[in-house]
Amino acid sequence: MMRNVQSFYFLFLLIVLNFHVVLSAVCIGQRATTTIWLNQNGDCQDVGFCQYLQNCTCWHGNLVVKSTKYYDEENFKPYFPKLREITGYLLISLCTLKFFHLFPGLTVIRGGDLILNYALVIYYNEIKEVYFPSLTAILNGGVHIGRNHRLCYVNTIRWKSIIKDIHQTGQYGIYLESNKLNCDLGCLKGHCHPAPGHDGDPKAQYCWGPGPKKQQNKAQCQRFCNTQCGPEGCLDGSDHICCHHECLGGCSAINSTNTCHACRKYRIKSTGQCVSKCPRKQYLVDKFLCQESCPYWSINSTEYHHYLWQGECVTKCPVNYISNNQTKKCEKCKSGMKCNTVCKYQDVMADGTLYNGALIRVPSDISKKGLVGCSVFEGSLTFQLQEGTGKAEDSLNELKSLKVLKGHLKIQKSSLKSLNFLSSLEVIETPQNALLHNKYVMAVYENSQLSELWPGNESIIVSDGGIFFQYNPRLCPLHIRNLQDRIHYKNGSKVTGEVSLQNNGHKVLCDTQMLVMHVEEFIPPDLNMETDMTAIECNSFKCVKVTWNFTMTSAYNNILFYAIYFKELQSNQEAVVQLDNECQNNDDWNVITVDIPKIESLEQSLFLQSKIISKLTPYTRYAFYIKEIVSKGEERSSHIHYINISQDLPSEPLGVEASFLSENKILLKWRAPSKPNGIITAFKIYYNKPDYSFWEEQKVLDWCSRDASRDKNAKDVAGYPVNKENYNQYCNISCVCDEEKENSKAIKADREAHNFNVEFQTELMRVLFTKNKFSYRNKNKSPPKIDFSKNISLILSNKILTSTSTTVTQAKIEIIEEPKVTVNGNIFSYVISGLDYFEDYELKVCGCTVVGCRRPSSTINLDCGIVQARTGVNLTADNLDSKMVRVQVQLDSYNISWIAPHKPNAVILKYEISIRYALDKDALVICRPGYLPTYIIRKSRFGNYVAKIRAISPAGNGSWTEEIHFKVAELSVTKNNNQLIIGIISAVSAVIVALLVFILLYMFLHRKLEKDVQGVLYASVNPEYMNSKEVYIPDEWELNREKIELIRELGQGSFGMVFEGIAHGIGDHAELRVAVKTTNENASIHDRIQILQEASIMKAFNCNHVVKLIGVVSQGQPTFVVMELMGRGDLKSYLKERRPDDGGIPLMRQEIYQMVAEIADGMAYLAARKFVHCDLAARNCMVASDFTVKIGDFGMARDIYERNYYRKDGKSLLPIRWMAPESLKDGIFSTASDVWSFGVVLWEICTLASQPYQGKTNEQVLNFVLSNGHLDYPEGCDYQLREFMSLCWHRDPKMRPSFLEIVHVLENEVDDDFVMVSFYHEMKRKALEDIYMKSESYIKSDAYTMSDGYTKGDGNMQNMLSRSQNRKSAIEKSKERLSISSLDSGTYVEKYDANDTPEEIPKKKKRPRSKRNSAVDSNACETKPMLRVESLYDNHDAFSENMQYGDTPVGKSDLMHPETNRELRLSEIFYGKPIPV
């Protein structure tokens, strides 16, 4: 019984365990790389293979996913959820899928094979989003994601957590380039945080997409596992429960080797179990799988035989072992037995031809191409190792076992210093057809670093051919001679050596005989099927044809071949052939070898030879010369010939950058192309919105449950890494001659990136367009093919290299895009305006030469610079119109409707409707998606309600509308009487509505008839062309239109454009520069009346610190208002120009106080004239050419001569950020409210035109100011200016200082020019003159106040007589520093002395004003000692009894603190106590 229970329990455990077991299906491709073809609908083109791959959990090999233009009627969607492991690389390119979700279960990419060091490549696709939610490990190789102009969520992945090889750094590690910029990235709120050990920021988020979506309710988070678990990974659904140590990348059950997603070492193919070593009777295959037999063990197949060696299946036996085809084993060589490890390899060259041998470009090619441990290599070996590819000698030592080479040996343009790795070479058996140039068994040439060969005295036996050593500047000829003595043919004779003693080692090249050569640019003929490949290349590239004479001489047998040398030169540079030192050598010459012609008859004595050289740089000067390479005797060469290659289309501009300037402007910058290929005549700019926008997914994404988040990682510059978490700094170390160094690091970086992209694209082309097939393809269908005869040049230019066929598929028609802007070739920036708010734009810059212009191309070869940018935010674009919000109440429900914003920021994502029941404290906020109709209908209980609405866009939240109050009435009737009551209510409502409409119409017409000029409707026969003189009476200010000449636009005014112009014959001026305000052509009559009313207001002003009116042109259209020209524009723009961060000169302290005094003086003048400005701000203050600041823009000014304040009616736009609390609350505008605005202007000056209340909406500003709030004082600003602001922002308008008082305090801070022309000093001088005249006449008077005029006292004659002499003396002293203002603001009179009388003062001679000093004062915003508050005059003693503020006399003693004996602060003078700042 117990045994049965134990058996049952064991069986139960086995069932539970097997429930978690994932059956492993390892699939092995018949080729190293297999392609998944997708048609235009995204269906599998090869259904057989896709069905086969769907059942695979591991793919042994490389996978390529790409689309084809060809279409088969299949409906098989690619989806491979079981695939968890790829042993090679994964390439996704030329794919038109929108969302790439093909491999949701892919966990590990081993990187056994790489594309230029990359294991995952996503390149040049139209994919918007990739999704690898299970990917946790890339064992070898890096990640390259580039040229995907729609792909977002690239930088929200922490690639460093996926790449496991810490040595994969720099551009060969993680390279993310030219993907979609300005993505609005945001992972699902509250999700996607990394596990411990991956990121120091616990709030960081990493995800593959926004999530959730309707199709899948997932957060799309990147999968993380606690780093303490190591590479084995975590249990599915957990980030801290570790898997078995034999696992890799994760598992589906813990403590089990059967549930691993991938194996850390080996996997048993039959069961999927992960093991550290293969069990008995199973063999290790490809260092990856354990299986019962080696693959391809077949009697009929010997090509892919595997052999057993120490429990492993190998394709070749190691050193000292020999393969036995009978036993399929590697047997150890017996003593005295000749034991060789035979290797062979067939390489593919860049042009697609096969090379019977191995081409070694990088050290890793030794192991990648199976050459490690080879003793016999059947094929040729070519070494072209470039500098910077690693320690080549260490990797090449793996070839030290090479003894027999059955091909030629070629070492060319290599960075090798020694050939010691060939020290074991004994035999070179080269077939006749394998000789290099049909002559050479060994060729070593153009190796700049090679200094020694290999040591030893052993002989080397060659079967045929000779040796060739040329242009090895560091290789001593003695070494070559020693090696040559050791090389013998099989018959014992020494090998012939074609070795030049002139160009091996440090020798100077010299010629005794000259060859005749001719060079000309080659124009290819029309293409046809008989055209050779060289001519086809010349159709796309520049070519040169080199021709020379070959003369038959007795030395014919000594000529090996001809070498054509050529190189690029500067414009007028001469070429020099020399080998002087390390930097100036012959390595900068390119060389092409040409075989000598075959002599059919000895009677021929003269031959004409030619060679076409292609791929030359257009618009470049080249030098050419040709030389004979001989085995012995003298070498002949030609003179150096020069040729200028013609122009061609330029390459793409470099450094294309875009940044927003405002809500509808983008600044586009670029640099000249790296290959201009001629003189750049123009640049054509294309821009449009991308055909895909992230916000178009608003119908799929639930924005009511998420917040819109901008990409905070995105940089302004396109094409550079944006997420520093995924990048390591790198640099290329190489020897560069001083004269070749770039002047600009940015240009050098651009060129290095360009060269790297060329290298990567070349390797990518080799992978993408290599012929490939798979055995599971449907046999009833032929693969896609192309007819080359249709368009050879198109095939070459687009690199479409596929199989040939007799069937032709219709090509996709490309829409030609027209340029939006064309600029000159010497311009490298442009401001694009008129764009939509907060929208993404794709901008392209294409260069032009005299040959033509590049155009944006849809192919992988990009011809234009491409960048993406987004415009700025319009702060009011998302605001809803409160007037358009409607509420309809129907019994127990209500309907709220509104009108969407006309031009929002990007798109409205959602609306928030706040509804509060009158008896409830909190409001209910309802979300309405932006794509739905703008209304909501809700059931409700009876009572009063308050509602408001706001719109939310990608730019943020709009302002709330005004609150709407409505009531849902209680139902008090029975259900049976509902219809009757509704009918009665409807009838009564219709009658009431009709009466209301009639009454409103009557009132509207009646008011229209009674309006005055500001609102009168003037009748006219032709109202749209109404003449201004019907509403405006010309006076002495009227000017002749013909005397006004408009020059250029200055900007937009209140009613139309503002122009700079010249007024001819105005007053004493022959020509006077003026500013001219005009109305728009389509301006209404009301606008024309308004501009004339503004001009009428200005007629009353004559102050140096108020913009002056020159005249009016009211006759005809358009109306002109001619004003004084303010050459430096408005104060706000001028302050921005002075920002040090933007290269401006900071304001000095004197300038700040001068500006403040001039503004206060101008406002004091307006206050004295009983005018309230209502819109005082830095934008409405103007700066003249001599830096004088004046008050301007009276569009809102009102005359309040008979009342002290103005209550504004209506609801027009108001400058809320500058308005006083009483203006915001009650609509009261007065001089005191202008003082509040003046304080805001002070704040603008101190912050150099920053936005007041930055970060707050208008609604928030309104509530903040009404809640006793005001602006924060600028940091580091002068203490007195801060105290001025505090005084101006007093809550009680009566407690704010007047403008004259402000100027009085600043009197000692202004320059002499201000004293001559200010309104304040003019009032002061009038008071002085009045006192002077009355003192002379002994008029009975009391003390006078000098602040705003003078007042009479008690008339004490004796006191007046006793003080008159002192007063007169003080006046005469004060007059020495005063001068009288002239009516001409541009001049002032000379100073008068004490003997001048008031009648003599105006007779003084005028002289020009001095320019203001604009020197830099770095301490302009630092705290200064307190201003000295003095009396109106310098002499305290003389006038201490005559000073007063209001009704309180102020003397010298009153200006001192009674306890500390210090000077009083401004607030202490005005209010009697300090006001805290």
Swiss-Prot record:
Q: Which residues form the Fibronectin type-III domain?
A: 652-750, 780-869, 880-971
Gene Ontology CC: axon; insulin receptor complex
As for subcellular location, the record says: Membrane
Q: What is its main location?
A: membrane
Keywords of the record, alphabetical order, are: ATP-binding, Glycoprotein, Kinase, Manganese, Membrane, Metal-binding, Nucleotide-binding, Phosphoprotein, Receptor, Repeat, Signal, Transferase, Transmembrane, Transmembrane helix, Tyrosine-protein kinase
UniProt family annotation: Belongs to the protein kinase superfamily. Tyr protein kinase family. Insulin receptor subfamily.
Biased segments, Basic residues type: 1403-1412
Enumerate the cofactors the protein uses: Mn(2+)
Query: What is this protein identified as?
Result: Putative insulin-like peptide receptor
Q: Which reaction does it catalyse?
A: L-tyrosyl-[protein] + ATP = O-phospho-L-tyrosyl-[protein] + ADP + H(+)
* Gene name in the database record: HTK7
Q: Give residue spans on the Extracellular membrane side.
A: 25-980
> Which Pfam family is one of this chain's hits?
Recep_L_domain
